[in-house]
Amino acid sequence: MSIRIIPQDELGSSEKRTADMIPPLLFPRLKNVYNRRAERLRELAENNPLGDYLRFAALIAHAQEVVLYDHPLRMDLTARIKDANDQGKPPLDIHVLPRDKHWHTLLHSMIAELKPEMSGPALAVIENLEKASEQELEQMASALFASDFASVSSDKAPLIWAALSLYWAQMASLIPGKARAEYGEARQYCPVCGSMPVSSMVQIGTTQGLRYLHCNLCETEWHVVRVKCSNCEQSRDLHYWSLENEQAAVKAESCGDCGTYLKILYQEKDPKVEAVADDLASLVLDARMEQEGFARSSINPFLFPGEGE
């Protein structure tokens, strides 16, 4: 199944009703997204061997929350939605969408917010990034979007990505349209921006029992049926792994066909699970999956592959 975003004026009344039944896309609702993530990261940091890094990630998430309200984004995306729909492309495609300098503003505001909380090597990284030219910032952004992770140091990548993510999430939240699921090209990437998922979540509430993949860039979620590999769409050789028991709120779904895995979080097991935070806090499960010979099909925005990985 592929997912297309249809401009509001092109949706018939029957399509509008259908789109409301099982939403193929859940556009980001940015109110409290970053505060909730920061709180969850701090909570998970307790008694976790990665506690210090989880608390560092929480500081970045909190800075995103502050900067989000200090620098709102206003733009009309109607024409872009129509063009993308005609071309069958994501409307905010990371590979073709021109980047506005707004994300530079977001980055420098985040740096200003973070500096008083930093010391030692972390402060040196932030100060070095603060001095980077616009060209250097754009080169790092392009490298990350091209998955050329060796070209961006692993200590700078999460900060660059955090600013880009906030920019893309602001744009995604302004999209004027609804989504329609269609048979066609497989869509293991975000239908809004083309980036990768960070994890998937089986939700509660109005989308009870439905699984949505969570974009690691624009914070959009898109529906993928359960018991199907989100990477290759096969279902014959899926297995579920956890570090606890069958009732664990965080599991890894592995696929023997393509040799990859993706975390799957269950809100019914723990309503507080958060797509980015719980994925980052369960790296021991990633190590286990690597031992079993599976490759990760997602990237956490706070942990990028380094050179040689």
Swiss-Prot record:
Family annotation (InterPro entries): FdhE-like_sf (IPR024064), FdhE_C (IPR056796), FdhE_central (IPR056797), FdhE_N (IPR056774), Formate_DH_accessory (IPR006452)
Which purpose does this protein serve, as stated in its record? Answer: Necessary for formate dehydrogenase activity.
The processes (GO biological process) annotated in the record are: protein maturation
Secretion signal span: none
Alphabetical keyword list: Cytoplasm
Localization recorded for this chain is: Cytoplasm
Gene Ontology cellular-component terms listed: cytosol
Per the UniProt entry, what species is this protein from, by scientific name? Salmonella dublin (strain CT_02021853)
Q: Which family does it belong to?
A: Belongs to the FdhE family.
Note the Pfam families from the entry: FdhE_C, FdhE_central, FdhE_N
Database matches in NCBIfam families: FdhE (TIGR01562), PRK03564.1 (NF002925)
Gene3D superfamilies from the UniProt entry: FdhE-like domain
Q: What is this protein called?
A: Protein FdhE
Write out the GO MF terms. Answer: ferric iron binding
The record's listing under HAMAP family reads: FdeH (MF_00611)
